[in-house]
Amino acid sequence: MSPQTETKAGVGFKAGVKEYKLTYYTPEYETKDTDILAAFRVTPQPGVPPEERGDAVAAESSTGTWTTVWTDGLTSLDRYKGRCYHIEPVPGEEDQFIAYVAYPLDLFEEGSVTNMFTSIVGNVFGFKALRALRLEDLRIPVAYVKTFQGPPHGIQVERDKLNKYGRPLLGCTIKPKLGLSAKNYGRAVYECLRGGLDFTKDDENVNSQPFMRWRDRFLFCAEAIYKSQAETGEIKGHYLNATAGTCEEMIKRAVFARELGVPIVMHDYLTGGFTANTSLSHYCRDNGLLLHIHRAMHAVIDRQKNHGMHFRVLAKALRMSGGDHIHSGTVVGKLEGERDITLGFVDLLRDDYIEQDRSRGIYFTQDWVSLPGVLPVASRGIHVWHMPALTEIFGDDSVLQFGGGTLGHPWGNAPGAVANRVALEACVKARNEGRDLAAEGGEIIREACKWSP
């Protein structure tokens, strides 16, 4: 054996299993401005101390494996390892705790949400030492934020493109979601836009099915957009769903939308994937298209309170990957605590700088620097009588999206759109006059009904 390859017994590498806490639990660690910070809700198996599971999360989501390997000696684990630097109990939950983990920035590819999630929420979620694991929040450092393009255009550029200011935007999802022919679909789009809405929307299920191929839908919707624009003098749009089975097909549909001259396309970013979403976002910025994002499949990931990811993490990821709108749900009729949590991630979508506020579910201060903001889309079972609350809660920088709340009007689609627009303008006017929308909302809507055509 040559001197270069000879291994001497008892010298150098020592095989065996090390306890994670000896390497990855570092309560004395002071986080760096360049670290990605994560807050995990950990539910360990019975009898396992918190620090032994917090360090396991840090290890399994960074450089760790189940045993010591000789190639550990070929790199600097202290430079690249994740560190569990703080553990705190969850109030009211005896068997849960929050583990805070810091990841060095060099662990992640620049501008790739896909790579970031592959590490942080990869195999560790199947770790058998844990009963459940939930990622509650991430702090994205400025150094990493600056590697992302973010939304194609952002809130201010969208308002400038549409020439619409001082109020929320109005939308409507065309129903029934499946089964209409392209021509009948386009007719419904026209009626809603002509009645006063700013946007109509493809349902997330609508791609290119036998009853309505995508190219036919795009053509009839473009006709509806141009006809309603000519009659109202306002810029209109329809969220043309470009989601497809391949990235190439998705971009082909976006190219056709651009050739038609329409202002906006749509993508299902979770089912489509972050790589596809970022590719489409880059195309939209380069070609002047707005990008509406639907969150189909989010409840599979975020519904369980002790496992998966909170939606605020998915919202941050979308702002990085790129989208001008994203569905955020509504808070109408919800408990006050849920309202605060929802508005916490709405601020994470819109604002440049958000302070830590645990009462609103914000675990870390987040600085987005120059990354454009995203308009939250309030949808799901809302109607005209919710307008005062929606206007007060979401403010001007939002999209209020009514499906059945428009198309379910007893007089038809266009009167439903008129009702939405009249109610919105009445609420904005009342708010600007200093009236209390929470206390006087019903009266404001009834007054608008009285004088509405």
UniProtKB/Swiss-Prot annotation:
HAMAP family reported for this sequence: RuBisCO_L_type1 (MF_01338)
One GO cellular component term noted in the UniProt record for this chain: chloroplast
**One Gene Ontology term from the biological process aspect of the record:** photorespiration
| Gene label | rbcL
Tell me where in this chain the PTM N-acetylproline is found. 3
The protein's GO terms of the molecular function aspect are: magnesium ion binding; monooxygenase activity; ribulose-bisphosphate carboxylase activity
Please tell me where Mg(2+) binds in this chain. Answer: 201, 203-204
Q: What is this protein called?
A: Ribulose bisphosphate carboxylase large chain
How does the record describe the protein's post-translational processing?
A: The disulfide bond which can form in the large chain dimeric partners within the hexadecamer appears to be associated with oxidative stress and protein turnover.
In which residues is substrate bound? 123, 173, 177, 295, 327, 379
Please give the CDD domains that the UniProt record associates with this protein. RuBisCO_large_I
Q: Which InterPro entries match?
A: RuBisCO (IPR033966), RuBisCo_large_chain_AS (IPR020878), RuBisCO_lsu_C (IPR000685), RuBisCO_lsu_C_sf (IPR036376), RuBisCO_lsu_fd_N (IPR017443), RuBisCO_lsu_N_sf (IPR036422), RuBisCO_lsuI (IPR020888)
Q: Family, per the entry?
A: Belongs to the RuBisCO large chain family. Type I subfamily.
What Enzyme Commission number(s) apply to this enzyme?
4.1.1.39
- Cell compartments where the protein resides: Plastid, Chloroplast
Catalysed conversion reaction: 2 (2R)-3-phosphoglycerate + 2 H(+) = D-ribulose 1,5-bisphosphate + CO2 + H2O; D-ribulose 1,5-bisphosphate + O2 = 2-phosphoglycolate + (2R)-3-phosphoglycerate + 2 H(+)
One Pfam match: RuBisCO_large_N
| N6-carboxylysine modification, residue list | 201
Which keywords does UniProt give here? Answer: Acetylation, Calvin cycle, Carbon dioxide fixation, Chloroplast, Disulfide bond, Lyase, Magnesium, Metal-binding, Methylation, Monooxygenase, Oxidoreductase, Photorespiration, Photosynthesis, Plastid
Q: According to UniProt, where does the site described as Transition state stabilizer lie? A: 334
Q: How is the cofactor bound, in the record's words?
A: Binds 1 Mg(2+) ion per subunit.
| N6,N6,N6-trimethyllysine PTM sites in chain numbering | 14
Tell me what organism the protein belongs to. Crucianella angustifolia
Location, primary (coarse class): plastid
The Swiss-Prot or TrEMBL record lists the needed cofactor(s) as:
Mg(2+)
**Active site residues according to the UniProt entry:** 175, 294
Tell me the function of this protein.
Answer: RuBisCO catalyzes two reactions: the carboxylation of D-ribulose 1,5-bisphosphate, the primary event in carbon dioxide fixation, as well as the oxidative fragmentation of the pentose substrate in the photorespiration process. Both reactions occur simultaneously and in competition at the same active site.
Database matches in Gene3D superfamilies? Ribulose bisphosphate carboxylase, large subunit, C-terminal domain, RuBisCO large subunit, N-terminal domain
